[in-house]
Amino acid sequence: MRCVPVFIILLLLIASAPGVDAQPKTKYNAPLTSLHDNAKGILQEHWNKRCCPRRLACCIIGRK
């Protein structure tokens, strides 16, 4: 019977512990999603510089 309070306290501590971070991190602790967003923005910027405004049809098709 002495173990029951200890067991209940342990269950409460486990339930209140912070969860594992769902965002994968790089070795420099930066979320990979921000790196992905940055790369996507850079590619979009280069795409716009290459296409627009000389070939408007190219930009319209590329934006989907």
Curated annotation (Swiss-Prot):
- Membrane-crossing ranges are none
Location relative to the cell:
Secreted
Where is the PTM Isoleucine amide found along the chain? I61
Among its keywords, does the record have Disulfide bond? yes
Leader peptide range in chain numbering:
1-22
Task: Please provide the record's keywords in A-Z order.
Answer: Amidation, Cleavage on pair of basic residues, Disulfide bond, Secreted, Signal, Toxin
Q: What is this protein's record name?
A: Conotoxin Ca5.3
Q: Native species of this protein?
A: Conus caracteristicus
